[in-house]
């Protein structure tokens, strides 16, 4: 999988740029604040439909401009695709091969990317919502070729049913049939979501083991789903109908208390991913260095699972990895990426710390949003 060409117009501080990328390492250098991360953000937007900085479309426009436009030409499984993303205040539009797409997440079907930024550490240190988002994205991208209903569709329908039940909880009177209808739908979708998450984590674990070893960690990191159904037995993970029945019963039993609190407390929207290093909670007992390598290993395991699913490696997009890893960590990371043979994008103002031996990088230098190919790394980026 490869991004061959990218055109940007009025994106962040970039007025206009057209870039052709190499099949291996593409190294983006330049002073801080001049557009290195903006370029990676554009690539991530074309691959995932969302900003890795969690910015709305209005914030991505160049100052004073009404809209921005990204266009990427990709090769995936020997097929070419043309991806476009238009954004303006309160509105965005996506086209794939000239046809409008109903959801930005559809971009991932033509361009898969694994993105590593300093914020990746949030997988370990932040609350359950960040980890749920991670496993849901992996379940969507790694399950989309199996013919089953997309995890993204299931998750979207679940959120609609959840909002509907939460509205019922605030009403003074509700007919029994209405409770039954929404709770049955919520339980069925919730069981499907929980099972999808459980299955993708089962597939992710062996890849995580290998990536940790490649990154030089002797400890074992386990990632498990903490689900409310666990206390009622583990059989739910293998039996979707049993999980749905359990959810229906729990929703009915907790209806009175949830009416008092005003929100649904039962369901996969309350799940978490438990990360343990040699049996100990990583967030509480892991060192900063261990947490950083563990978070990186999770993203690399995601990439390997994608490769297993798609038959080719996704793009690797790394924003200033040298700021998060020591010399040994960088050497191991770049060696691992070189062995993968996929297309890599690295932005760094510490170019001298990137061990690119064997990767033959294509180098870009950016100055105030203007990009140029360069044979040498300018001294101010060293």
UniProtKB/Swiss-Prot annotation:
Entry annotated with the keyword Transmembrane helix: no
Cellular component aspect of the GO annotation: cytoplasm
Residues engaged in binding ATP: 30-37
Pfam (any one): SMC_N
Keyword field contains DNA damage: yes
Key words, A-Z: ATP-binding, Cytoplasm, DNA damage, DNA repair, DNA replication, DNA-binding, Nucleotide-binding, SOS response
GO-annotated biological processes: DNA replication; DNA synthesis involved in DNA repair; double-strand break repair; SOS response
Molecular function via GO: ATP binding; single-stranded DNA binding
InterPro entries tied to this protein: DNA-binding_RecF, DNA-binding_RecF_CS, P-loop_NTPase, RecF/RecN/SMC_N, RecF_2
Family per record: Belongs to the RecF family.
Name of the protein: DNA replication and repair protein RecF
Organism (species): Magnetococcus marinus (strain ATCC BAA-1437 / JCM 17883 / MC-1)
């Amino acid at each position: 999988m490869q991004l061959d060409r990218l055109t940007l117009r009025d994106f962040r501080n970039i007025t206009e740029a057209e870039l052709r990328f190499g099949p291996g390492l593409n190294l983006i250098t330049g002073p801080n604040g001049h557009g290195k991360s903006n370029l990676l953000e554009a690539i991530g937007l074309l691959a995932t439909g969302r900003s890795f900085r969690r910015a709305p479309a209005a914030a991505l426009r160049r100052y004073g401009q009404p809209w921005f436009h990204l266009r990427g030409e990709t090769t995936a499984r020997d097929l070419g695709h043309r991806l476009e993303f238009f954004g303006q205040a309160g509105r965005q539009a996506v086209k794939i091969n000239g046809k409008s797409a109903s959801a930005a997440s559809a971009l991932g079907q033509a361009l898969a990317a694994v993105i590593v930024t300093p914020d990746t550490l949030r997988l370990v240190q932040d609350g359950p919502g960040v980890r749920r988002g991670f496993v849901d994205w992996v379940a969507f991208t790694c399950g989309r070729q199996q013919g089953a209903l997309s995890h993204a569709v299931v998750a979207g329908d679940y959120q609609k049913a959840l909002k509907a039940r939460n509205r019922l909880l605030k009403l003074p009177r509700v007919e029994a049939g209405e409770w039954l209808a929404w709770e049955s739908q919520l339980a069925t979708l919730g069981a499907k979501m929980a099972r999808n998450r459980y299955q993708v984590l089962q597939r992710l674990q062996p890849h995580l083991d290998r990536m940790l070893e490649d990154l030089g960690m002797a400890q074992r990191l386990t990632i498990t789903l903490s689900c409310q159904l666990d206390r009622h037995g583990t059989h739910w993970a293998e039996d979707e109908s049993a999980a749905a029945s359990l959810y229906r019963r729990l929703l009915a039993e907790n209806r009175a208390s949830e009416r008092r609190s005003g929100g649904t407390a039962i369901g996969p929207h309350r799940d978490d991913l438990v990360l343990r290093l040699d049996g100990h909670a990583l967030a509480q007992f892991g060192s900063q260095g261990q947490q950083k390598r563990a978070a990186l290993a999770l993203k690399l395991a995601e990439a390997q699972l994608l490769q297993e699913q798609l038959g080719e490696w996704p793009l690797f997009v790394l924003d200033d990895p040298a700021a998060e890893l020591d010399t040994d960590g960088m050497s191991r990371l770049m060696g691992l990426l070189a062995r993968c043979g996929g297309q890599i994008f690295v932005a760094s103002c510490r170019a001298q710390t990137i061990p690119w031996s064997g990767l033959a990088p294509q180098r870009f230098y950016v100055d105030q949003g203007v990009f140029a190919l360069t044979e040498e790394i300018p001294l101010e980026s060293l």
